[in-house]
């Protein structure tokens, strides 16, 4: 039973699909995709449930969402294990993902109040009131890299605002989505408020193009996001929130603590096997002896990164990539850069055939005149040596993306200079660029998004403002407008 529609589990009526543990190549979940008719049923169920869900009021909705938080807390070990098996990420990392899902509840409640709450201003003859209303039925498209946390970051604020949801997870992580919906069901969510449709491209297209959805919240590749943006052209009445990738730069300038810099570089480039949209893809290090020493230490540290299966003991830093196909894609990306003149300082390689396990790579691309502006979504870091800080910033900005960027530097003036000139939605100083606060907005510019920042600002795209002028009774003004006689 792979589809959850109107509070009931159904088998899909499409074709057979399975989910593979990428560290072993073994199937861990099997199901049948949703057809366009089942997608239609899910949207109809969400539509039928929406007004009553909204009319429950915020406190009642929050109470049910809090019950979901309790279910997450009670089942966190089991959910973390499912995420680890299906994504290949190490157990320590998936435990932090479930922790982020739990923390999202309080953050979303606070954001709802701060970003989209109710505000009243008393006037001489009445009052001005600002309220917010839900859009209605929204589709949530989830990614595979954080299959619990990232869709959760759309679903929770959407529900708190009074929307109902049709959730289409990544076809690579269906088991995680199924486990999430079981917890929502146990939390007592009314029928139709969340509906799950599992499937591949055909299922996604049926949902994205459905005339009865009022919005779509997407986390995933820039390519798919741009297709959705084109599809929604001419539909100004629908809200579209796109959270996409990046070709993210990290610049190092004048750092005295080389060991700490190496640590932040590794955390920026190789965490989650490089499968975070905020991961550093390009590293800029000054020419000279200090830069040479930093690179030497970085090479040693990258070679020492432990890679292993999700359940390996001791636990590895890097687990598997999402699939063998993804692993082969990174090997091919490295070969492309080498053919253009890149020199591998640490060779990325597939660790075991038939799996998504790869070792991390570091490649010097300084001599490549036209560096491809691509998001290589894996553990491959491109190194560029520079002599001039302005030139490093110019190169860092030479991308159509604009998600995250960072500077490792002892001098605050250097950071202020960098901050004023860099083009990105997340800009960190002396911190890994994969680090982001849930109490802040999360999003980028350019090909990284469409100005609908998520995280704390997700509340903004989950509701629309309603401005009212109100009085308790009708009354005559002190004087009539010219030309009136009543």
Swiss-Prot record:
It catalyses: N-succinyl-L-glutamate 5-semialdehyde + NAD(+) + H2O = N-succinyl-L-glutamate + NADH + 2 H(+). It is an enzyme of class 1 (oxidoreductase). Its EC number is 1.2.1.71. GO terms for molecular function: succinylglutamate-semialdehyde dehydrogenase activity. Coiled coil: none annotated. Keywords: Arginine metabolism, NAD, Oxidoreductase. CDD domains: ALDH_SGSD_AstD. The active site is at 243, 277. NAD(+) binds at residues 220-225. GO terms for biological process: arginine catabolic process to glutamate; arginine catabolic process to succinate. Pathway: Amino-acid degradation; L-arginine degradation via AST pathway; L-glutamate and succinate from L-arginine: step 4/5. Belongs to the aldehyde dehydrogenase family. AstD subfamily. Catalyzes the NAD-dependent reduction of succinylglutamate semialdehyde into succinylglutamate. HAMAP family: Aldedh_AstD. This is N-succinylglutamate 5-semialdehyde dehydrogenase 2. It comes from Shewanella denitrificans (strain OS217 / ATCC BAA-1090 / DSM 15013). The lineage of its organism: Bacteria, Pseudomonadati, Pseudomonadota, Gammaproteobacteria, Alteromonadales.
